[in-house]
């Protein structure tokens, strides 16, 4: 089989692994809340029902999809080969991603990064929607959940940004040396 060379190859997204949820704040606007266990969401009810049997929790509808707040903070997963990890500073608005940078270069405008260079100042402005947030994405396979596809874990946290990339590199290196 010969792939089309100018199209990115990928597995279908089966669902999302979430570490937070939104709760109503004092002003009526939604406020993010960190969870102690994982929350899984998918467009396919059967995947969420299977996950609930494995990891506990009750299946419910959520924004046109299905979700389960699991009862576990550990989920067995596999990292498929290829580009399954990405990190950017990103700023989103109602119209989509407005900035995507690496801390120096902003790729959507092909210009310099517009955010402050100092992390604490950037974090403060990001909390107000005025600067980019670190955005770390990792695609994994949940081998015990039926179906083919990846589950995307996305984090905007500092520790995910500084630790996950090193963990993925370590796992890939160990795999190349047949340690895993």
Predicted regions and their residues:
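A recognition module on extended beta-rich or small alphabeta surfaces enriched in W/G with H and D/E
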Residues: 174-176
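Conserved small/polar residues in nucleotide/adenosyl-binding loops
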Residues: 179
């Amino acid at each position: 089989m010969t792939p089309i060379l100018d199209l990115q190859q990928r597995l279908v997204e089966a669902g999302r692994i979430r570490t937070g949820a939104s709760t109503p704040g004092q002003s009526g606007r939604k406020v993010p809340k960190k969870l102690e266990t994982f929350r899984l969401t998918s467009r396919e009810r059967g995947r969420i029902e299977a996950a609930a049997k494995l990891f506990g929790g009750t299946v419910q509808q959520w924004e046109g999809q299905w979700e389960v707040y699991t009862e576990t903070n550990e989920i067995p997963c596999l990292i498929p080969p290829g580009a399954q990890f990405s990190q950017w500073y990103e700023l989103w608005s109602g119209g989509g991603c407005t900035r995507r940078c690496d801390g120096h270069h902003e790729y959507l405008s092909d210009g310099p990064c517009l955010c402050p260079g100092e992390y604490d100042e950037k974090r403060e402005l990001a909390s107000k929607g005025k600067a980019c947030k670190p955005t770390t994405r990792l695609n994994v396979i949940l081998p015990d959940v039926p179906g083919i596809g990846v589950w995307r874990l996305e984090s905007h946290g500092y520790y995910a940004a500084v630790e996950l990339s090193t963990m993925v590199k370590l796992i890939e290196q160990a795999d190349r040396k047949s340690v895993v």
